[in-house]
Amino acid sequence: MALEKIITAPKYKNFTINFGPQHPAAHGVLRLVLEMNGEVVQRSDPHIGLLHRGTEKLIEYKNYLQALPYFDRLDYVSMMCQEHAYSLAVEKLLNISKDIPLRAQYIRVLFSEITRILNHLLAVTCHAMDVGALTPFLWGFEEREKLMEFYERVSGARMHAAYIRPGGVALDLPLGLCEDIYKFSKQFASRIDEIEEMLTSNRIWKQRLVDVGVVSAEQALDWSFSGVLLRGSGIAWDLRKTQPYEVYDRMKFNIPVGTRGDCYDRYLIRVQEMRESLRIVMQTINEMSKGIIRLDDRKITPPTRDQMKQSMESLIHHFKFYTGGFVVPAGETYTAVEAPKGEFGVYLVSNGTSKPYRCKIRAPGFAHLQGLDFMARNHMLADVVTIIGTQDIVFGEVDR
């Protein structure tokens, strides 16, 4: 008697696909290994390090002033905010935090908020382009061009400014710049309205973002999220309010907070943060008084060009400052600022020489990218692009 063959259903196993690093939605050099069940993501494994340049080690071989430009090149979309964190850390070690001139503090806050608008414009419009809306991207870059002109007029560079330095800022604001920033601020609110008109109530935009990449408040804290990803989950934590630095305690602004913790909430928060940054920009312009823009201590800040050409002592100070740097007392500090992407922190250790003994950089994007696996799980492949866009990842700071 012939045995009946038992028919069993074939076992389908998941397959893996590589997303990036050449993919236009990978936001740089992200390589994702996705485990897929059909069109549904079961697991995502980010492979980082393709933009690793050894920044933290390089800083150990430079003096404190020479190390500053490395911070522009970490998150190369929010440059001055990172210079700001480093400068505050060095000032803490030098014990001069309370001596920074008031005008310099206002200028720092002004350009930190201009940088925040620069970052959020890129984040929102590139996110829209990833999802399929090209027009806001073109509008956003038109406005970013104006902001980069302000960067250029104050520092000579459109991106890597090296403008905020320990002890103050490199140069005073040129004549007419405050008036031009004021004019920009008056018209920029209507540009935000145009972007919102295109996206906020758009049916397709909402279908792609609502209930995608949901992060609960508990998950956000467990994964060390900060910035927009933390506030999108309903936690009103902003270092400018909770741990004010510079003149943020004098500024009136609100912290936008989400309720659902999804991609749509995070989009709305970024748009609202641009409006709040405009409020701060207007306040700094109105309240800024005349005065010196860096500490009057020739061991920490260089003399002006005029002084250098008239006084032999100033020339000697200038030469010694730029060749040997300045000695920082032994100690350590962790200093954080509210960068556009989240909490950007610098852990700086000094051994009493003119070079840092150790500089550990806490990049917000690194923590956010770790959460991609649980955020993308059980979503479609197309939603992964949306989630990466809403995380606002830049690989300069992730890979360092």
Curated annotation (Swiss-Prot):
Keyword set, alphabetical order: Electron transport, Mitochondrion, NAD, Oxidoreductase, Respiratory chain, Translocase, Transport, Ubiquinone
Subcellular location: Mitochondrion
Uppermost EC category: translocase
Alphabetized Gene3D superfamilies for the sequence: Cytochrome-c3 Hydrogenase, chain B
GO molecular function terms listed in the Swiss-Prot or TrEMBL record: NAD binding; NADH dehydrogenase (ubiquinone) activity; quinone binding
Pfam families: Complex1_49kDa
Gene Ontology annotations of biological process type: mitochondrial electron transport, NADH to ubiquinone
GO CC terms, sorted: mitochondrion
Catalytic reaction equation(s): a ubiquinone + NADH + 5 H(+)(in) = a ubiquinol + NAD(+) + 4 H(+)(out)
Enzyme Commission number: 7.1.1.2
PROSITE patterns xref list: COMPLEX1_49K
Protein role: Core subunit of the mitochondrial membrane respiratory chain NADH dehydrogenase (Complex I) that is believed to belong to the minimal assembly required for catalysis. Complex I functions in the transfer of electrons from NADH to the respiratory chain. The immediate electron acceptor for the enzyme is believed to be ubiquinone. Component of the iron-sulfur (IP) fragment of the enzyme. Component of the iron-sulfur (IP) fragment of the enzyme.
Family stated for the protein in its record: Belongs to the complex I 49 kDa subunit family.
UniProt protein name: NADH-ubiquinone oxidoreductase 49 kDa subunit
Organism this protein belongs to: Prototheca wickerhamii
Gene: NAD7
